[in-house]
Curated annotation (Swiss-Prot):
Pfam families with a match to the protein in the record: AAA_lid_4, RuvB_C, RuvB_N
Keywords: ATP-binding, Cytoplasm, DNA damage, DNA recombination, DNA repair, DNA-binding, Hydrolase, Nucleotide-binding
Region (Head domain (RuvB-H)): 256-348
Species of origin: Chlorobium limicola (strain DSM 245 / NBRC 103803 / 6330)
Residues annotated as binding Mg(2+): T67
EC assignment: 3.6.4.-
Protein name: Holliday junction branch migration complex subunit RuvB
Alphabetical GO biological process terms: DNA recombination; DNA repair
Molecular function as annotated in GO: ATP binding; ATP hydrolysis activity; four-way junction DNA binding; four-way junction helicase activity
Length: 348
């Protein structure tokens, strides 16, 4: 049985754990320094004016702290927060109920906002710009629109795929902030802090080892820490040492660069089955037995960041670094790798 620890979504138990270790003030939020510095200025200015903060769009790979920052924004504004997700807002009435229940200055947090149905999304336009919504009553010849005023509020939207947002929705966010992957040093500090909350010590070398294999993602670092805690408790060890951390990571088959079994399967497929690419996302998903959306949203961003995959108009291609590591034939490194122009997001 394959254990996919790195890339699985947060479950209920993990969500409760994240709530326990979640910082509640901007000064306690580790990383994303420029982003948080700017937000502090915007929040302070809004409070000085007595206005609601401009609507905020938080984008970036999963597990980097978008939900945490949404709660911090509400806390810094001294406001309440209502949280939901795009897939749950399947009817306009669900959104209308949330909007009409907001008090002045409240924060409405919509996770996975790119998955909100277009018909529901359109209700947000007037709510975000004019703080009103138009509700249709009855149907057919007797149908009529009723305009409801709502209190000024701040919408915080989180997305892992900002490119899927419609232009009208994206244009209504006054603050657009993108999350970057974390450095190993920052992850090490996050691990040490979380270990104190878990009630088990971790030495510096162990924290560094876990941080180095966490793919630049705090959520993954915390998952690995919890698994290392399990190994330490079974071994009746009062402290997570480097030896225990190494045993944990080896048993979970997570290598020095944080790649797990599925990452390696994806790379092996591109390099050896498709001769380095290009290969389309749909073909790749079928070959590895994974959903296309999961490939694009969960696995691919880190593989691109790590320099193993490049995206082109004709599909994914393996880089020379990938060929050197994953090719079963040394001669594979001689093939043309970048015949096609890179997409815009690869130039950044």
């Amino acid at each position: 049985m394959r254990i996919e620890l790195l890339n699985t979504p947060a479950d209920a138990l993990e969500t409760r754990f994240e709530e326990q270790i979640r910082p509640i003030r901007m000064l306690d939020f580790a990383g994303q320094q420029r982003l948080t510095d700017n937000l502090r200025v915007f929040i302070s200015a809004a409070k000085m004016r007595g206005d609601a903060l401009d609507h905020v769009l938080l984008s970036g790979p999963p597990g980097l702290g978008k939900t945490t920052l949404a709660h911090i924004i509400a806390a810094e504004m001294g406001s309440s927060i209502k949280a939901t997700s795009g897939p749950l807002l399947d009817k306009a009435g669900n959104l209308a109920g949330l909007l009409t229940g907001l008090q002045k200055g409240d924060v409405l947090f919509i996770d996975e906002i790119h998955r909100m149905p277009p018909a529901v999304e359109e209700y947000l336009y007037s709510a975000m710009e004019d703080f009103r919504i138009d509700i249709m009553l009855d149907s057919g010849p007797s149908a009529r629109a009723v305009q409801l005023r709502i209190e000024p509020f701040t919408l915080v939207g989180a997305t892992t795929r900002s490119g899927l947002l419609t232009s009208p929705l994206r244009a209504r966010f006054g603050i657009n902030s993108r999350f970057d992957y974390y450095s190993a040093d920052l992850l090490e500090k996050i691990i040490i802090r979380a270990s104190g909350i878990l009630g088990i010590g971790v030495d510096q070398d162990a924290a560094a080892e876990i941080a180095g294999r966490s793919r630049g993602t705090p959520r993954i670092a915390n998952r690995l820490l919890r698994r290392a805690r399990d190994f330490a408790q079974v071994a009746d060890a009062p402290l997570i040492t480097r030896s225990i951390a190494m045993t944990t990571l080896d048993c979970l088959e997570i290598d020095e660069e944080g790649l797990d079994d599925m990452d390696k399967k994806i790379m092996d497929t591109i390099v050896n089955k498709f001769s380095g690419g290009p290969v389309g996302a749909a073909s790749l998903a079928v070959s590895v037995g994974e959903e296309q959306d999961t490939i694009e949203e969960v696995y691919e961003p880190y593989l691109i960041q790590a320099g193993y995959i490049a995206r082109t108009p004709r599909g994914r291609v393996a880089t020379r670094r990938a060929l050197l590591r994953f090719s079963v034939q040394e001669s594979r490194g001689d093939g043309p790798l970048f015949e096609f122009p890179l997409e815009d997001d690869q130039r950044q």
